[in-house]
Amino acid sequence: MGIAECYEQKMKKSLSALQEGFNTLRTERATAHLLDQITVDYYQQPTALSQVATVSVPEARLIIIQPWDKTLLADIERAILKSKLSLNPSNDGKVIRLVIPPLTQERRKELVRQARALAEQARVAIRNIRREGIEEAKRGHKEGLLSEDALKAAEEAFQKATDASVADVARYLAEKEKDILEG
């Protein structure tokens, strides 16, 4: 794998991280990904909710959490209340139900701001990856490992990958904004 391909993979990882970040933003539609950031103390160890319970979405605005160990119900409930999701869990002794309430216009605007901030972080990360790649190619040129033509080709490849990745960020952001604003 060449230098450009290696850095292109890093750009794709930045895009994946952006999508994971978008998944944690609450919209009016229930998804299991909404709870990805929630951890529960399980034997004094912070453990991902998905590792201690089954999370299902039977309806568009309902999430059901069924822990494998019923003694975790209170801990899961506490973890959800402490999260930034603004959700009120309902514990019936067997499962926890999360009803996703409609978003207020103010909350929608806040979520759009958060989505834009995540997108900007991704763009900055992608540009930094491009800069690192170009610097590595220039070092290779100085050391005689790359010819002048190979250096130019590498710089063009980095720029092309950066442009494509930044366009993907813009597309993902537009989709997420539409999802947030239209519910």
UniProtKB/Swiss-Prot annotation:
**What is one Pfam family matched by this protein?**
RRF
Stored InterPro entries:
Ribosome_recyc_fac, Ribosome_recyc_fac_dom, RRF_sf
Q: Name one GO molecular function term.
A: ribosomal large subunit binding
Subcellular location(s) per record: Cytoplasm
Q: Listed GO cellular component terms?
A: cytoplasm
Main location group? cytoplasm
- Which Gene3D superfamilies does its entry note? 3.30.1360.40, Ribosome-recycling factor (1.10.132.20)
Family recorded in the similarity comment: Belongs to the RRF family.
Return the protein name: Ribosome-recycling factor
> What is the organism of origin for this protein?
Treponema pallidum (strain Nichols)
Task: Name the gene.
Answer: frr
